[in-house]
């Protein structure tokens, strides 16, 4: 039998900072864009999305990241997060198509007093760039011959095309000087 008295015990749990978790991201767009391909970085944090302070992005394969869609400000250092997200813009290398890979991390603002900020493990990101039909490029040529020939002077026309020579379907010849 219990003959003792009851009592109340107060337990105080002091919260500790939990590291954010950077989320795997994927984006896509066409090669040689006029505006950058938007890539949304994202992270979760057990302490709340507002606690995610910034992202740090690694160098992507086959292109460059910018902080603006006009692609005038390359990403350097960290990028501020708003509610666990930030958008950067990818410019693929000229005529690149395929998958560009990168990694990034998220950093939080730490404990309530700002101490002990934590960084997530790296998350993977991909940007899939689709090919577009590039215009062929004419190759300058010259031809020489004698004045007043009985038959015309042969001129070889040639061009290059990123998709292969089979894609060059026709040539248009304008007026010639002196002839």
PLM ranges: what are they?
Residues 2-14, 112-132:
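C-terminal edge beta-strand
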Residues 5, 16-60, 66, 93, ...:
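Extracellular ectodomain surface segments
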Residues 61-84, 177-179:
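Low-complexity "stalk/linker" and mucin-like segments enriched in Ser/Thr/Pro/Ala/Gly
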Residues 82, 94-98:
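Surface-exposed, short loops/turns at beta-strand junctions within beta-sandwich domains
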Residues 86, 98-102:
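Exposed beta-strand face motif in extracellular beta-rich ectodomains
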Residues 87-91:
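Exposed aromatic-hydrophobic patches
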Residues 92, 106-108:
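Conserved structural position at the C-terminal beta-strand
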């Amino acid at each position: 039998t219990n003959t003792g008295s009851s009592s109340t015990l107060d337990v105080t749990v002091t919260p500790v900072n939990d590291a954010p978790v950077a989320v795997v991201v994927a984006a896509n767009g066409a090669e040689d864009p006029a505006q950058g391909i938007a890539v949304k970085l994202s992270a979760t944090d057990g302490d709340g999305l507002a606690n995610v302070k910034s992202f740090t992005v690694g160098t992507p394969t086959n292109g460059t990241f910018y902080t603006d869609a006009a692609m005038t400000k390359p990403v350097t250092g960290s990028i501020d997060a708003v509610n666990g997200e930030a958008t950067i813009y990818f410019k693929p290398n000229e005529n690149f198509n395929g998958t560009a890979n990168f990694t990034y991390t998220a950093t939080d603002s730490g404990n309530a007093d700002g101490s002990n900020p934590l960084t997530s493990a790296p998350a993977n990101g991909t940007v899939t760039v689709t090919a577009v039909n590039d215009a062929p490029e004419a190759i300058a040529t010259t031809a020489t011959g004698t004045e007043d020939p009985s038959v015309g002077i042969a001129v070889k026309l040639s061009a290059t095309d990123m998709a292969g020579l089979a894609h060059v379907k026709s040539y248009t010849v304008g007026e010639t000087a002196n002839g």
